[in-house]
Structures are given as C-alpha cells and as structure tokens.
C-alpha cells in the first residue's frame, strides 16, 4: 500500500480545525507532517522477508515467544490498543528466526483494526509461511477506546486467541502452551 502523505496532512489539518484547534499555532504547526511521517513509518513494518530454514529431522517441539509488546489502533475510534502477544508454533521441517516472530506481530499491528482480526492474521500468516504442526497466538491488550471514553474502564484487559493444528486438536499441547505463557505471572 502507498501512503499519501499530502492527504494525511490535509486530513489532520481539517481534523484539528474540526475540534476547534488552530493548526497554525506553535504546538500544532508541524503536527500534520508528524502524523503523516508516523503513518509512513507504520507502513514500513508491513514489508518483511520471512527467512525460513529447512530443518529436516531437527527440532520438532514447541517454540514460544512470549511477552511481545505491540501497539495498534482500534479501527472504530482510531484510539490505541496495546499489550502483549504470545506466539507459539510446532515446527514441521521449517523454522524461522525468533526475531521474525516479533516482526510478524509488528507487520500486522501497525494499522487500524480490531484485536480479534489481528490475532487471526498473525496465526494465519505463520501457518501459511511455516506450514507447522500448529500455531497458537494469544494477545492481551488495554484498549484506550474503553479506558478514555464509553465505559471508562482502564483496568480491563481484552484477551483473544487463535489456535491451529495440534494446539487446537490436543488439549495437552494447548495446556503446555498456556502454562508456558502464564508461568511468569504472579499469583
């Protein structure tokens, strides 16, 4: 997707005027450019090469990367939601570098969306690229659209999950994953 920085700048200028602000005042003068640059940066996360290693007969146990910090925007109010993603897969002859898991989370996070779709997109992408025996994604997030407006409940955490393959079919595998991602939490 191509970012149209001029349209973003115009829209932000109109938005500021719409809420009664002067887009030419000192603190806001460069805001339209800053916002356009921010979206350009977000767009750069979408481009990534998934380096995959063929590991015939090698590691076939669960790989978990937990507590991946992520930031996204609620598509309904354009307010941030943020939290932690926990991602696992069980290799079937293919593995990827651990940093690629974080990059996949970033790839899908930096855009307006709902958490449910974000969770599913991460799992589906890993399923397609790695062709593993299973993928598990759990995301925990605070939604500012619920904290700052509406119900105004800043303490609530939304948890979504997407499980495929052995994580979905085998209770022991699912329990192992959940134990691994929760083992560090205080009781």
Swiss-Prot record:
Sorted alphabetically, the keyword list is:
GTP-binding, Hydrolase, Metal-binding, Nucleotide-binding, One-carbon metabolism, Zinc
Q: How does it assemble?
A: Homomer.
As recorded in UniProt, its EC number(s) are 3.5.4.16
**GO cellular component: a single term:** cytoplasm
State the gene name recorded for this protein.
Answer: folE
Q: Which reaction does it catalyse?
A: GTP + H2O = 7,8-dihydroneopterin 3'-triphosphate + formate + H(+)
GO BP term (any one): tetrahydrofolate biosynthetic process
Question: Which family would the database say this protein is a member of?
Answer: Belongs to the GTP cyclohydrolase I family.
Asked if the keyword Hydrolase belongs to this entry, the reply reads: yes
Q: Please name the GO terms that the record assigns under molecular function.
A: GTP binding; GTP cyclohydrolase I activity; zinc ion binding
Q: What is this protein called?
A: GTP cyclohydrolase 1
PANTHER family hit by this protein: GTP CYCLOHYDROLASE 1, GTP CYCLOHYDROLASE I
Pathway per the UniProt entry:
Cofactor biosynthesis; 7,8-dihydroneopterin triphosphate biosynthesis; 7,8-dihydroneopterin triphosphate from GTP: step 1/1
* Top-level class of the enzyme under EC nomenclature: hydrolase
For Zn(2+), which residues are the binding ones?
A: 74, 77, 145
Record-linked InterPro entries: GTP-CH-I_C/QueF, GTP-CH-I_N, GTP_CycHdrlase_I, GTP_CycHdrlase_I_CS, GTP_CycHdrlase_I_dom
